[in-house]
């Protein structure tokens, strides 16, 4: 059995299929883990989502910011933009089933036998494994409720929840977890989340900002952390226990697959339009 981890697919279904063919992926024996953002921007979000649903227990994904955004669009809480490239999936006959499937997906996953954690954007440096589990579970619970659109999705868009406050309750607590696990790149030196800078560290001009993974963290010492979201890194983080897998396929770069057991990365360049 092999565990394959793939970066942000964002509708780049043809590239995903070529990657899986390169490693002879077989869902009857292997598992495909995705760092989230299965949809948006790329040409085949519908095919990507249907493929993951078809894999059953052989597919493990976490929610990314674009996956949550799809829920908001389906619930008529946001207006779709041409850059989302989500009209096909929103008009598909199985959109409700797709949304229900996404609602069952967590914000973090673990592979305990390999001391590995996967989330879309990373893990807040102050969080222990216990806190990470608890906070992610609160969001998952809210997503599974009948009133998830009104109680969570309609209120999740906020930059106000930028600082971890263990005494926070209700939507503010859920907002911070969503912001941290699906949107985080840089933190201020006081630990606040920054939502503006998307540049790689060498191009960041604000001396008050540091990448989240450069802060001291108990989980950074004990676990391999697999994440996506930050395409500008292009996988370059300088630490073998950090696996940054978003390599900008939807922006014209490439899609990256990491074979855990071999500690090997396989890439597929963005295909040219025919």
Swiss-Prot record:
Assigned protein family: Belongs to the Ap4A hydrolase family.
Record flagged with keyword Hydrolase: yes
NCBIfam families (alphabetical): apaH, PRK00166.1
EC number: 3.6.1.41
One CC-aspect GO term: cytoplasm
Catalytic activity: P(1),P(4)-bis(5'-adenosyl) tetraphosphate + H2O = 2 ADP + 2 H(+)
Keyword match Hydrolase: yes
Name of the protein described by the UniProt record: Bis(5'-nucleosyl)-tetraphosphatase, symmetrical
Physiological role: Hydrolyzes diadenosine 5',5'''-P1,P4-tetraphosphate to yield ADP.
GO molecular function term, any single one: bis(5'-nucleosyl)-tetraphosphatase (symmetrical) activity
Signal peptide interval: none
Alphabetical list of Pfam families matching this protein: Metallophos (PF00149)
GO biological process: RNA decapping
Keyword annotations from UniProtKB, A to Z: Hydrolase
InterPro entries: Ap4A_hydrolase (IPR050126), ApaH (IPR004617), Calcineurin-like_PHP_ApaH (IPR004843), Metallo-depent_PP-like (IPR029052)
Organism superkingdom: Bacteria
């Amino acid at each position: 059995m092999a565990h394959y981890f793939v970066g942000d697919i964002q509708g780049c279904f043809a590239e995903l299929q070529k990657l899986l063919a390169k490693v002879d992926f077989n869902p009857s024996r292997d598992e495909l883990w995705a760092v989230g953002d299965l949809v948006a921007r790329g040409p085949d979000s519908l095919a990507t989502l249907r493929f993951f649903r078809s894999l059953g227990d052989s597919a493990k994904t976490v929610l990314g910011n674009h996956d949550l955004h799809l829920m908001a669009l389906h619930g008529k809480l946001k207006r779709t933009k041409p850059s989302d490239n989500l009209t096909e999936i929103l008009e598909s006959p199985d959109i409700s089933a797709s949304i229900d499937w996404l609602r069952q997906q967590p914000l973090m996953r673990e592979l305990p036998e390999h001391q590995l954690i996967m989330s879309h954007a990373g893990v807040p440096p102050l969080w222990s494994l216990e806190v990470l589990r608890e906070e992610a579970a609160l969001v998952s619970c809210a997503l599974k409720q009948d009133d998830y659109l009104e109680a969570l999705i309609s209120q999740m868009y906020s930059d106000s929840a930028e600082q971890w406050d263990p005494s926070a309750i209700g939507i503010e607590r859920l907002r911070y977890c969503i912001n941290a696990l699906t949107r985080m790149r840089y933190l201020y030196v006081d630990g606040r989340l920054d939502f503006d800078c998307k540049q790689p560290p060498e191009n960041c001009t604000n001396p008050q900002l540091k990448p989240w993974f450069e802060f001291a963290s108990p989980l950074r010492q004990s676990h391999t952390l697999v994440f996506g979201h930050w395409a500008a890194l292009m996988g370059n983080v300088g630490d073998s226990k950090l696996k940054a897998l978003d390599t900008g396929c939807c922006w014209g770069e490439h899609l990256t697959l990491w074979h855990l057991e071999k500690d090997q990365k396989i890439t597929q360049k963005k295909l040219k339009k025919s």
